[in-house]
């Protein structure tokens, strides 16, 4: 397990893994439990079946545009603990393959626009 503490560290590691392992890389080895901001994290990346279902996102508060323009992206995120999230505007905009069953279950939101 590799621990990251900032969004910039995480994005850099993701880009490296995608370069070496392709758009369906297994990223579950990354400990993201200290990250609070995942806004625009995957924005525009050519990803489809990356493995991030085991990520501990329980401290994340912002997922704004996280998968924006990730048209082929599909992953089961339904078990993510998103209880601290307050912003997800355009989180799945243009992520056409993501179904409601695969999306996290949001309850306490201030800014909502999943698209």
PLM segments and residue spans:
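Negatively charged
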Residues: 1-115
